[in-house]
């Protein structure tokens, strides 16, 4: 007849428990029956960690009884008042304008523009892609329009990365100029 024992509770003494001392085994069954109701807690001193855990469990039980919730908090469903009301959620739709925006405030981005600087898509065919010649012409027009003539102007010689040749020839073995003598030993 085993009772369900909580993990953190101190086990009680039962008649099924056998003493380790053989001299104590000679105790009569009447003595065991008298001790059956007693707790081993009288001889057992719990560790400070066990005492702390037991206090936390008791506080949790009292808190759950105060709130009227039974069972573990994980199994509880969320309360409906935790969800924001639908009327408080502002979901922008197409054509949405903020109600609290005053008429003197300008939006950050103007979406409707009729400027001539817009890219003209009518020049390109709708079949997927344009020919390479048409793209090349468009690039040249854009470069000329922006003031760049990169293909027509040759590179500046001052920008070459190859250093210019020196006026005085040098000897590779001792780095001496023509005015000094170079002696190989």
Swiss-Prot record:
It comes from the Eukaryota. InterPro entries: FAM219 (IPR029339). Residues 1-131 are annotated as: Disordered. Residues 66-80 have a biased composition (Polar residues). Residues 122-131 have a biased composition (Low complexity). Coiled coil: none annotated. Keywords: Acetylation, Phosphoprotein. Pfam families: FAM219A. The modification Phosphoserine is found at residues 47, 72, 102, 115, 122. The modification Phosphothreonine is found at residue 113. The modification N-acetylmethionine is found at residue 1. Residues 52-61 have a biased composition (Basic and acidic residues). Belongs to the FAM219 family. PANTHER family: PROTEIN FAM219A. This is Protein FAM219A. It comes from Homo sapiens (Human).
């Amino acid at each position: 007849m085993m009772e369900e024992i909580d993990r953190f509770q101190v086990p009680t003494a039962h008649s099924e428990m056998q003493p380790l001392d053989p001299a104590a085994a000679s105790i009569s069954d009447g003595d065991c029956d008298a001790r059956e109701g007693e707790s081993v807690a009288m001889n057992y001193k719990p560790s400070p960690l066990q005492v702390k855990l037991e206090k936390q469990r008791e506080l949790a039980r009292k808190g759950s009884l105060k709130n009227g919730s039974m069972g573990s908090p994980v199994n509880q469903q969320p309360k409906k008042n935790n969800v924001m009301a639908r009327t408080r959620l502002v979901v922008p739709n197409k054509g949405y304008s903020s109600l609290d925006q005053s008429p003197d405030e300008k939006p950050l981005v103007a979406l409707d523009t009729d400027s001539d600087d817009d890219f003209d898509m009518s020049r390109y065919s709708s079949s997927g892609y344009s020919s390479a010649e048409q793209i090349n012409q468009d690039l040249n027009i854009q470069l000329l329009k922006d003031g760049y003539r990169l293909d027509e102007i040759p590179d500046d010689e001052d920008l070459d990365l190859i250093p210019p040749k020196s006026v005085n020839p040098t000897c590779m073995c001792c780095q001496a100029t023509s005015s000094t003598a170079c002696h190989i030993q």
